[in-house]
């Protein structure tokens, strides 16, 4: 029951404010399922909605013989040293599945917490079965002062005419290195929406999820990233449009206040009549730091439509002066501009997830200004 889970959050020694930083709720009525993992141990998992399954990957493999067929199906074990590290017997992670035709609007919540291990190895499998709709919010964080590495393998399967939105909020520490490896398969008529939020300091994040998008399917990636002094973030998204009339959109908002950001984006038009748009915008808030945008558009057929726009710079003084003329102080004007820059309205995202994103951005403002 959810009441028991509230106690387990307390046992982790994480206060409610830290949980809020990664969108974690303690109210059963606001979630359709929950999963909580500390280091390599799945502490609790439950489903509160008939059309969704939530369990550890170990339990899923015991319950269903076919789950093993989804392991390393769209990612290679030998992709790099970090995928090889994750291919171990003690790996754990979440298994979340919406049943055929189920409409799960209330989000499933997954929390991955690094408490004391040197390397947290996770392998997650998410399946949105045919005609279903599934929304997930994943909050990843670490115990204050702990040094370590999070290696997260995630494979997403969006079946025919299904829709999956996945919002991931990270809040680590300057002693944590993060190496997610993610792939997504979007079948005919399916929709995948990814929202990645990183606003707090971290030692290093390096991630480049890839979506394989089939006929009449859509993949959308949104990211809001802040790098404070000492943080290095190498992040991007890739979409392979491999089916006729498939679509992709990659939108990133990056802010450097002394940190280093490499913002990547890659759309491959590998079928006729596909469309893709890539948008990279960066904001420099200090004299130090770096934002390096690396967009790539690749057309393999003549009748594709791929577009890109990018801009990196500082806050324009004219914008500050305009808001000050409307009665705001200089600090208030800068705060309003930064908040507006980070906010991305995502069509089709449930209000509960929109609110989690807005709340996370508001909490991060105090460290930016």
Curated annotation (Swiss-Prot):
Record's signal peptide: none
Top-level division of the source organism's lineage: Archaea
GO process annotations (BP): iron-sulfur cluster assembly
Coiled coil residues, start to end: none
PANTHER family to which the protein is assigned, alphabetical: FES CLUSTER ASSEMBLY PROTEIN SUF (PTHR30508), UPF0051 PROTEIN ABCI8, CHLOROPLASTIC-RELATED (PTHR30508:SF1)
Family: Belongs to the iron-sulfur cluster assembly SufBD family.
Protein name: Iron-sulfur cluster assembly SufBD family protein AF_2365
